[in-house]
Amino acid sequence: MLIAIEGVDGAGKRTLVEKLSGAFRAAGRSVATLAFPRYGQSVAADIAAEALHGEHGDLASSVYAMATLFALDRAGAVHTIQGLCRGYDVVILDRYVASNAAYSAARLHENAAGKAAAWVQRIEFARLGLPKPDWQVLLAVSAELAGERSRGRAQRDPGRARDNYERDAELQQRTGAVYAELAAQGWGGRWLVVGADVDPGRLAATLAPPDVPS
């Protein structure tokens, strides 16, 4: 079973991935996790990160160029994802294809039914062959709370300076709205929307009931 955890920067995705992994293991399931972008492992991801911190000229100003870099990062992990899915009962991804659709649409002031989201779906799923997730879980929190967490994370870790996307509060708000639309229309497969107070054990049981094989 392939599960993608989605949400704006600072939503708490990493924490949810850790807690959900623990819940699945407690239920007797084997679990693997993978986070995107794969900074430090993927040239495409590293170039994107550098662009979001002011390098590479005007690269970051191009929505489609940045989206392509993030897509190529995931494309480079296709075989890794497939291997994990064969070797484990549950594979949990911290961000996946929907993040590209949400941020790209938000940057262009489009909604989930716009050209950017449709393009991401064609490029990543159809052209690059990314496997579709069995579930996409949207961790829906307020933009204010996400912003506070993002700022706090940067203060605690001097090496984790916020990038251009993370510093743009209006972009984060628009991205959250697009995410909600993607979930409502079932973009790319099944969605489940949860809040910051979600119980990991109950979430695991909903995503993969104990009597249903992964």
UniProtKB/Swiss-Prot annotation:
Carries keyword ATP-binding? yes
Q: Which Pfam families match?
A: Thymidylate_kin
Q: Binding positions for ATP?
A: G7, V8, D9, G10, A11, G12, K13, R14
NCBIfam families per UniProt:
PRK07933.1 (NF005923)
User: What is the name of the protein in this document?
Assistant: Thymidylate kinase
Stated role: Catalyzes the reversible phosphorylation of deoxythymidine monophosphate (dTMP) to deoxythymidine diphosphate (dTDP), using ATP as its preferred phosphoryl donor. Situated at the junction of both de novo and salvage pathways of deoxythymidine triphosphate (dTTP) synthesis, is essential for DNA synthesis and cellular growth. Has a broad specificity for nucleoside triphosphates, being highly active with ATP or dATP as phosphate donors, and less active with ITP, GTP, CTP and UTP.
Look up the EC number in the record and give it.
2.7.4.9
Give the quaternary structure.
Answer: Homodimer.
Q: Which gene encodes it?
A: tmk
